[in-house]
């Protein structure tokens, strides 16, 4: 490999702010911020909005959306037609 053209690979502390979870991962991410981790060492610090700790696909939690409300309204309106009064 040519010297001086590759980014520095080092441990970086990522913080998922929505779940308040920290991940210490090897990365080449550039940042000017630093933060002291629970091990007492100071690492480069990057904040995240979403990670595997907070994303609904990984947590199993579903967030209610407008379309889910419309489906629930449809099911409520037509619930009597399926195996209901006329059968």
From Swiss-Prot:
<keyword id="KW-0687">Ribonucleoprotein</keyword>
<dbReference type="GO" id="GO:0006412">
    <property type="term" value="P:translation"/>
</dbReference>
<comment type="similarity">
    <text>Belongs to the bacterial ribosomal protein bL31 family. Type B subfamily.</text>
</comment>
<dbReference type="InterPro" id="IPR027493">
    <property type="entry name" value="Ribosomal_bL31_B"/>
</dbReference>
<dbReference type="InterPro" id="IPR042105">
    <property type="entry name" value="Ribosomal_bL31_sf"/>
</dbReference>
<dbReference type="InterPro" id="IPR002150">
    <property type="entry name" value="Ribosomal_bL31"/>
</dbReference>
<protein>
    <recommendedName>
        <fullName>Large ribosomal subunit protein bL31B</fullName>
    </recommendedName>
</protein>
<dbReference type="Pfam" id="PF01197">
    <property type="entry name" value="Ribosomal_L31"/>
</dbReference>
<dbReference type="InterPro" id="IPR034704">
    <property type="entry name" value="Ribosomal_bL28/bL31-like_sf"/>
</dbReference>
<keyword id="KW-0689">Ribosomal protein</keyword>
<dbReference type="GO" id="GO:1990904">
    <property type="term" value="C:ribonucleoprotein complex"/>
</dbReference>
<dbReference type="GO" id="GO:0003735">
    <property type="term" value="F:structural constituent of ribosome"/>
</dbReference>
<dbReference type="GO" id="GO:0005840">
    <property type="term" value="C:ribosome"/>
</dbReference>
<comment type="subunit">
    <text>Part of the 50S ribosomal subunit.</text>
</comment>
